[in-house]
Amino acid sequence: MATILIIGASRGIGLAALRAALKAGHTVRALARSAAGIPVTDPNLEKFTGDALDPAAVRTALQGVDAVIQTLGVSPSPEMLFNSTRLFSDATRILVAAMQECGVKRLICLTGFGAGDSRNHGSFLFNSAFHLFLGRVYSDKDVQERIIQESGLDWVIARPVILTS
């Protein structure tokens, strides 16, 4: 079985991926800002407290890993309407460089429907609301996807539409 690093493993889809990987028999390394709060204990789970924007933390978590699942997210807030973010692109630049340095080739990244070439594939009403409320976040996800696509890694980008937990 593989050793998988999950970045953003403390909640939501990252936590679900962690549980699924353990259930499938994989060894999981979990990097999260609040790793102590990951509500899973398993002999095949190693938790790392660290930030996806910290190159040293990412390199440490990558040691001995066969593949990476990146599930970064931001909590909805009014600031999303007015402020841009670089979380996704900055963290991905750091991750890709560290993966190349450590010789890790496989990356699965979750962005979201509306990123990259899936932008503007909804109805007029959906697209208008989407750009108003999430446009700044998804502009950074566009950059994130380009970084991955140009990385030379063996990658998969998944774009879920709605995540409910």
Each model region followed by its residue ranges:
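Active-site beta-alpha turn of Rossmann-fold NAD(P)-dependent dehydrogenases/reductases
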Residues: L72, I108-T111, V161
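N-terminal Rossmann NAD(P)H-binding glycine-rich loop of SDR-like oxidoreductase domains
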Residues: I4-A24
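Short, polar loop motifs at secondary-structure junctions
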Residues: L31-G37, I162-L163
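NAD(P)H-binding glycine-rich loop region in Rossmannoid oxidoreductase-like domains
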Residues: A36-I94, A98-E101
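Conserved beta-strand positions in the Rossmann-like core of class I SAM-dependent methyltransferases
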Residues: L5, R29, V156
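Conserved beta-loop-beta element that borders a ligand/cofactor-binding pocket
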Residues: E145-S165
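Conserved catalytic-site region of short-chain dehydrogenase/reductase
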Residues: S77, F113-R119, L163-S165
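Conserved Rossmann-fold NAD(P)-dependent oxidoreductase catalytic core, especially the SDR/UDP-sugar
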Residues: R29, A35, D90, I94-R136, ...
